[in-house]
Amino acid sequence: MRMVFRWFGAGNDSVSLAHIRQIPGVEGIVWALHDIPPGEVWPLSRIMEIKEQAEQHQFHIDVVESVNVHEDIKLGLPTRDRYIEAYKQTIKHLAKAGVKVICYNFMPVFDWVRTDLYKKLEDGSTALFYEKKEVDEMNPKGLVETIASNKTFTMPGWEPERLASLKTLFEAYEHVSTEDLWDHLHYFLQEVIPVAEACDIKMAIHPDDPPWPIFGLPRIVTNHDNIRRLLKLVDHPTNGITLCSGALGADPNNQVPEMIREFADRIPFAHIRNIKRFDNGDFVETSHREQDGSIDIVSIVKAYHEVGFTGYVRPDHGRHIWDEQCRPGYGLYDRALGIMYLWGIWDSVQNGQRMHDLTAK
């Protein structure tokens, strides 16, 4: 298990590389060029700037999250080939900087969805919150205004250029069925996987968050069967998944440890986080500690150890604690606590295995 930490870049993140360097066991940053619109090539010079900044703090930049997929590709429009070619060129540029994994998603219009970025919790901290009834009754424009109200930081997946054409996008997706979206993903993967393979880069799709349709838009990476289908679209080790325990775990029917065991060799990157589910479909982000939420974090880490996981993992969304002023879900303190909790489980399992091996001799 190789621990990494998401960093949004100098001037775009309240957390410094110097502070991340002080978290035990973190070896690299998970990064992106957030100002480059989907469909444009990432300049090699900009990529190398990030690499240089990271290496000054002894970090690698092996994992990128995300290289966003242009909506024309998801819609299957004739213009998609131009954007796919740009995506291929970005893959080649990233390979020159030593990148090994590209996390991306194939969610129409919206990336992750929450209704409250600062939900007050019982302990006085705040966290990301999803209220199902509000989403069911909300006009999509209202959701955009909720997310856009955070003026301090850019919000990945909620870029202004994407949301400015919201009405047009919704009209375009009226004609896209779930099977159409699968076909468009298949087309995309057939084009980019050979390039990624040649560049020794793994493509790792992120599950839909939350894992069910919203506003009538199709969502296709939501459960065990979907993931199995995804991996067979282009059945090659380069075609993988970013296994996110929080996104998949929002659906109580998803058994993440079982997914880890079945798909182990196709998981180059993992997000581990905890959420507390409610019977009405709501959920709230919690600390990583298993008892604080509904996700079986201990069994998840044990499953990764059991399969000999050597991929990258990062703590995911944390609470906002100790009056930290930070990007929603991405402060320093709670994610650092999460890392130490994950290491504690991992080390405990590893030491237990070592003792078992010694006594068995």
UniProtKB/Swiss-Prot annotation:
- Pfam families, from UniProt? UxuA
Gene name of the encoded protein: uxuA1
Enzyme Commission no? 4.2.1.8
* Class of the enzyme per the UniProt entry, highest EC level: lyase
Q: Which cofactor does it need?
A: Fe(2+); Mn(2+)
User: Could you state one GO biological process linked to this protein?
Assistant: D-glucuronate catabolic process
Q: In which pathway does it act?
A: Carbohydrate metabolism; pentose and glucuronate interconversion
Biological role: Catalyzes the dehydration of D-mannonate.
This protein is called what?
Mannonate dehydratase 1
Q: Which family does it belong to?
A: Belongs to the mannonate dehydratase family.
Q: Gene3D superfamilies, from UniProt?
A: Divalent-metal-dependent TIM barrel enzymes (3.20.20.150)
Q: InterPro entries recorded for this chain?
A: Man_deHydtase, Xyl_isomerase-like_sf
Q: Which GO terms describe its molecular function?
A: ferrous iron binding; manganese ion binding; mannonate dehydratase activity
UniProt KW keywords: Iron, Lyase, Manganese
